[in-house]
Amino acid sequence: MKEELIERFTRYVKIDTQSNEDSHTVPTTPGQIEFGKLLVEELKEVGLTEVTMDDNGYVMATLPANTDKDVPVIGFLAHLDTATDFTGKNVKPQIHENFDGNAITLNEELNVVLTPEQFPELPSYKGHTIITTDGTTLLGADDKAGLTEIMVAMNYLIHNPQIKHGKIRVAFTPDEEIGRGPAHFDVEAFGASFAYTMDGGPLGGLEYESFNAAGAKLTFNGTNTHPGTAKNKMRNATKLAMEFNGHLPVEEAPEYTEGYEGFYHLLSLNGDVEQSKAYYIIRDFDRKNFEARKNTIENIVKQMQEKYGQDAVVLEMNDQYYNMLEKIEPVREIVDIAYEAMKSLNIEPNIHPIRGGTDGSQLSYMGLPTPNIFTGGENYHGKFEYVSVDVMEKAVQVIIEIARRFEEQA
């Protein structure tokens, strides 16, 4: 199993599948289509049936039941794309067997070193086989680790028919990293009662609470004149953007928050005197606090419009996804089964809120309750990203055990 995990994962991460927020195609990048087509062939090779890839790049497949029991159809999902935060082109995965727990020089020439001082969890992987970057790209364990684990688990179940299970559906979705993963997902065609995203982090992660999320695009319009004769004429758009940001509470930003605390995050700011554009994301676990945060944004905009004119600030704000807890609670047994599966494998479940979102956040509101499970990755979206193959193996075992328990309890 370990060899298959390494072979598949290192091959998959070399395919550039970064999504692109500025693209209006579905999927947003051709690499995701290329990867999807490859997976269609490999799912067929493994022995799955009803393997499809639709015009939007969504890959689906079926592992038929091998029991006569009436077992609910369950699904396992992962996403095809990788993050846009750092380059994902020409990924060169580095395999470190029997890791000694000490610092790893990822790139001597660029002096990129993965250290326990900067990443205190690193020594806990002593003795593991870990896969890192070469210090020039992200790795793509988010979410090619989860995708690999699903492939390996399905292969294992096919070759071990003594493990009884109901019908299992598999799906690989595009554009998760830019919040569009479920946008064209056909829940009815998928046909599962429940699902799990394999899109978590370290060993034991079991998540069924996510942020409520919104995005706010602000355009600040200025008036540019010669600075020598600008008095009472110039309106500096970039300064308007700075003024707006100054109205937000400093301590309610990602770098100052944790746990169940929400935030405002200035994701990008660019412009000049004539026009400046800012993009914020708004996050909170509590629905009332979430609405209050959006109201704060709107109120600041109104104040500035009253001060500088209606055209000075233009706001576009849209909800992106909601806390999945509301939709998971009525079917809490799907969390309990995953919890029990981990415990039976001597894995201590680590239940905590997702300070982010998964496809499951949106899918749960589309009628497919979908908690999230660990994959073994650390430090996602950057050059210090790595994954433990030993933990990936545990994730495969959890998938298998969940499938077995649903059949056993039917």
Swiss-Prot record:
CDD domains: M20_peptT
Top-level taxon in the UniProt lineage: Bacteria
InterPro entries, A to Z: ArgE/DapE_CS, Bact_exopeptidase_dim_dom, Peptidase_M20, Peptidase_M20_dimer, Peptidase_M20B
Protein's UniProt keywords contain Lipid metabolism: no
Cofactor field: Zn(2+)
Molecular-function annotations in GO: metallopeptidase activity; tripeptide aminopeptidase activity; zinc ion binding
Cross-referenced Pfam families: M20_dimer, Peptidase_M20
GO cellular component: cytosol
Enzyme Commission number, as recorded: 3.4.11.4
Residues that bind Zn(2+) 2: D142, E177, H381
Similarity comment text for this entry: Belongs to the peptidase M20B family.
PANTHER family listed in its UniProt record: PEPTIDASE T
Protein name, per record: Peptidase T
